[in-house]
Amino acid sequence: MEAKKENLVEFQKRTGLQVNPDAILFFWPSRLDPFQKGVDLLEHIAQHFVTVNGDAQIAIVADGVGSDRTHADILGRIAYASNGKITYQPFSESLSMLGYAAANDVFGASLYEPCGQIDQIGNLFGATATNRDTGGYHDKIRELRLKRDGSPQDVGNGFLFRDYDPGGLWYALTRSIAFHRRSLKIREMQIKRIMKEARERYDLGSMIAEYVRIYERLNGGRPLA
């Protein structure tokens, strides 16, 4: 967790966020596509979410679709008015990787998603994953439930929402921030488990087999070869 704090501070310095190693960082790495990725839902709630949740920060490192700057401009204005609680940056591979390494939660709001990868990368970097319960995210994000809260065992790697509206995204992020406010001991135990399970699940052979399975399903169940 100390390494994540170091990455967080470096990310904050590079992006103009308030420097606070104890902030809870929500990282959006998906392209700014209102037809698939749900960026309009993010725009509706971002400012209010960081106002209500004083320990939260939101970072977006992404480009629009093609030459469309509509949502980049909207998010830029939201970030400018946030007093260092929200940052928008155009996509850069190095900055995006640092964002994953700094994040507590990697999130999105997809209307549909055949596969999706941001949850996998986030888990590998020690972040929970939050997204809409659809497609690949339905298959890969499992609700985080803890034995100490009554679950038979510690399971899950993130948080899902069903309704494609701002309230749905708000609901899932609120559940995520509640987890990230828990004691260091609890968080550290679960993040280590999530990272271990992600490494086991997303080794190269397993990932190839999973993608073949998904594309065969999209192909009407017919084998690809």
Q: Model segments located where?
A:
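Conserved donor-binding/catalytic core segment of Leloir-type glycosyltransferases
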Residues: 18-36
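A conserved mid-protein helix/loop that constitutes part of the nucleotide-sugar donor-binding site
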Residues: 34-47
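A charged, aromatic-enriched C-terminal amphipathic alpha-helix characteristic of glycosyltransferases
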Residues: 182-213
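Glycine-rich phosphate/pyrophosphate-binding loop
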Residues: 1-22, 170-185, 196
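Nucleotide-activated donor-binding/catalytic signature segment of Leloir-type glycosyltransferases, i.e.
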Residues: 53-98, 155
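Catalytic binding pocket for nucleotide-activated donors in carbohydrate/polymer assembly enzymes
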Residues: 98-189, 198
